[in-house]
């Protein structure tokens, strides 16, 4: 028997080669292919950072089994018996170990949360954002598979069986091996090239026989159904179109994610959304980071209100003791207003903490993490100087101690109180310097404020309301700037005189009887407190007038035209509509007759000359396969369904276009409303400041000779109402600005002009216009 091992060795080597090729199909190779596809997509890196809280501590190819629920574990063991997987243990960590290294901490270990830090932490730790990147990764994997499917693919297989006849002692082991390639080419032609061989081994005596070999090539070319690259490459085409759409969706989600972090509203649908995208309507409610800093400022405003109420209560009590208030009801009303203010302050702080905990969860952080919200973003809205609030609070405490009849105040105590007041000189001078800076900012803003007033006067809707030429006059701004400058100069002089009087009085306390010293010190401290209240109101006025906002001009039709060129979801909507049409084209092709030409050729060898092919052992076949469309009811129904699906997509696309136009019409109306409300709210704060100032002056008026020295019956109520009106107007002013700023951000998103930095932060374009130069 002739033994020929050549063909056997070749086939074994080829089989091992193909097997090694398959072993190279590992996750690392998949990662590399995805990176080649998506390397230029902004913000796309599906691999978690080492300092992410989402990072698996056991970052291995096969995850560690987590700890199971005990009752669920019993079910697994009962059914799977000894083959059940081993349960995890309680010590297994599911959270990344180094995530705290990413936290921007101060020296006390408290996270400092400004806008940039909030965005950075969200991109690191948010499972929502990570999910979107992983969905895009999976979409890229679909493309790698479709490309692999159309490439020439190797295949190899081996089968073996033992054969023994009952009456024979010989045992034969027969093995068959086959290897080759298969692929698609041309106009949908499929081809298969293979090599097969047979091997027989007699186990009883060790004889080896290599059987005949067969080389085969088969080509099948469709002539009707499926006879086009357009058809057989459809799956790859759709996979790559979907990948492009999803890459756009990730970028748009990144923009929407910024809006979510900042305003609490994400209009983006995200990756792997099927069909025509929806257009979410704009919501004027604001949460997120802007909502947090709005709450912080509301708390500051409430603290300033409580400080002013305390100061007013002290002055009213002094007036009551001096006989200038005949009814204690007014003092009690002021005290009740103070209690209400303090209660509101506690409620505001509790609400803020609850909102902050929820925001931590959104960022992917634990709710018990200590966080301090930094609010430089709304620095201009700190109408009340916190230093002055602190000084006023200290002065009120000193006045209470001086006037307390139950307190045993001696001369040394009064001298110490006086020195404490004089120790505030530097802080007072610093606040005066701050007032000058605020006035400088107001002066710098005057030209833009005047232009803004002119635009408001020219609006037709305001003219219809009677707010034309007599409203928003530039002369009022000039007068306001002049008055504030004069007030600042007067206050600087009065404060200097008051501090000089206090200094002399404190130095001469030792020569004055204790009761007289208490009265004089209380009077001077009370006078200083009144000056500080006026200084606080003046600074609030100056800062109020220096606040500005970006311009927004929206023409709905022009904005729609800009969005049609730049909006990523609009690009996807057009592509999705074409995808629906392409489905009808594919379904129509399925209705055609199956007519294929089959060409097949074999080249073989006999069992003796295995591996030595002979032309005499060859064979060539040509055939036609025909399958008529007599029973293609399922294909017919699919085609009809695809036609209906296209019409539905067409209507959805039209609805998408109309919804975009509707959103811009809303933006146009809202922007005008915000612009008007911004100035009206500013005027309301201005009026409230004037009311507080007037009520303060009335309280400090000296008695007129020959007239009733008592205050009016509503003096206390007027002062309390004025302070509460100032609080409400200040909060409303901030709320309008926050809403307007959130709308500006959203408008750039809706236009398709939003640009983010590498850190995911919005690049403010300044004025937001509906007509944008196209790139």
Which role fits each region the language model picked out?
Residues 58-121, 125, 551-556:
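Regulatory alphaC helix of protein kinase catalytic domains
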Residues 17-20:
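C-terminal motif of bacterial Sec signal peptides marking the signal peptidase cleavage site
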């Amino acid at each position: 028997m002739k033994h020929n091992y050549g063909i056997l060795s070749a086939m074994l080597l080829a089989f091992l080669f193909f097997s090694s090729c398959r072993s190279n199909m590992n996750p690392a190779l998949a990662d590399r292919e995805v990176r080649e596809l998506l390397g230029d997509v902004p913000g796309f890196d599906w691999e978690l950072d080492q300092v992410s809280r989402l990072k698996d501590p056991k970052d291995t190819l096969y995850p560690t089994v987590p700890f199971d629920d005990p009752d669920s574990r019993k079910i697994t063991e009962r059914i799977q018996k000894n083959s059940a997987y081993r349960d995890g243990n309680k010590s297994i960590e599911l959270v990344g170990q180094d995530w705290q290294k990413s936290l921007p901490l101060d020296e006390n270990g408290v996270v400092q949360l400004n806008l940039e830090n909030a965005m950075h932490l969200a991109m690191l730790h948010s499972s929502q954002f990570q999910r979107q990147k992983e969905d895009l990764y999976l979409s890229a994997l679909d493309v790698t598979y479709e490309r692999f499917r159309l490439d020439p693919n190797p295949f190899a297989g081996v089968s073996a069986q033992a054969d023994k006849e009952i009456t024979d002692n010989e045992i034969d082991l027969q093995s068959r091996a086959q290897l080759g390639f298969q692929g698609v080419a041309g106009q949908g032609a499929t081809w298969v090239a293979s090599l097969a061989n047979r091997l027989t081994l007699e186990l009883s005596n060790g004889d080896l026989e290599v059987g005949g070999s067969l080389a085969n090539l088969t080509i099948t070319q469709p002539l009707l159904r499926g006879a086009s690259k357009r058809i057989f490459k459809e799956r790859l085409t759709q996979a790559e179109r979907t990948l492009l759409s999803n890459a756009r969706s990730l970028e748009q989600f990144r923009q929407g994610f910024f809006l979510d972090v900042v305003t609490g509203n994400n209009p983006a649908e995200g990756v792997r959304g099927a069909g025509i995208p929806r257009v979410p309507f704009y919501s004027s409610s604001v949460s997120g980071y802007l909502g947090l800093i709005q709450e912080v400022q509301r708390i500051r405003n409430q603290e300033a209100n409580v400080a002013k109420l305390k100061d007013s209560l002290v002055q009213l009590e002094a007036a009551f003791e001096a006989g200038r208030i005949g009814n204690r009801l007014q003092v009690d009303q002021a005290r009740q207003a103070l209690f209400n203010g303090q209660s509101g302050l506690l409620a505001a702080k509790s609400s803020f903490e609850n909102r902050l905990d929820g925001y931590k969860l959104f960022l992917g952080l634990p709710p018990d993490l200590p966080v301090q919200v930094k609010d430089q973003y709304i620095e201009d809205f700190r109408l009340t100087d916190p230093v002055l609030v602190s000084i006023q609070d200290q002065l009120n405490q000193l006045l209470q101690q001086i006037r307390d009849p139950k307190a045993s105040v001696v001369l040394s105590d009064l001298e110490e109180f006086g020195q404490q007041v004089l120790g505030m000189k530097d802080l007072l001078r610093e606040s005066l310097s701050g007032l000058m800076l605020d006035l400088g900012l107001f002066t710098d803003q005057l030209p833009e404020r005047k232009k803004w007033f002119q635009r408001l006067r020219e609006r037709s809707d305001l003219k219809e309301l009677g707010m034309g030429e007599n409203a928003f006059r530039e002369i009022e701004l000039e007068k306001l700037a002049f008055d504030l400058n004069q007030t600042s100069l007067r206050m600087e002089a009065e404060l200097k005189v008051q501090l000089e009087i206090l200094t002399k009085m404190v130095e001469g306390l030792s020569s004055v009887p204790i009761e007289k010293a208490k009265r004089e010190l209380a009077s001077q401290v009370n006078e200083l407190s009144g000056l500080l209240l006026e200084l606080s109101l003046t600074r609030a006025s100056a800062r109020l007038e220096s606040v500005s906002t970006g311009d927004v001009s929206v023409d709905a039709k022009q904005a729609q035209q800009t969005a049609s060129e730049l909006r990523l979801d609009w690009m996807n909507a057009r592509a999705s509509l074409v995808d629906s049409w392409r489905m009808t084209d594919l379904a129509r092709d399925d209705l055609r007759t199956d007519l294929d030409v089959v060409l097949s050729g074999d080249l073989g060898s006999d069992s003796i000359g295995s591996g030595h092919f002979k032309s005499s052992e060859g064979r060539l076949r040509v055939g036609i396969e025909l399958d008529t469309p007599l029973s293609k009811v399922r294909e017919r129904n699919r085609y009809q369904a695809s036609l209906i699906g296209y019409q539905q997509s067409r209507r959805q696309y039209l609805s998408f276009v109309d919804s975009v136009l509707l959103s811009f019409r809303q933006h146009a109306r809202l922007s005008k409303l915000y612009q008007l409300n911004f100035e009206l709210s500013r005027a309301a704060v201005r009026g409230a400041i004037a009311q507080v100032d007037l009520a303060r002056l009335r309280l400090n008026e000296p008695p007129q000779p020959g007239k009733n020295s008592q205050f009016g019956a509503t003096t206390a109520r007027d002062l309390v109402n004025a302070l509460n009106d100032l609080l409400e107007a200040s909060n409303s002013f901030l709320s309008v600005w926050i809403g307007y700023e959130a709308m500006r951000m959203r408008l750039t998103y809706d236009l398709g002009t939003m640009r983010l930095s590498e850190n995911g932060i919005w690049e403010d374009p300044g004025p937001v216009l509906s007509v944008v130069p196209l790139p």
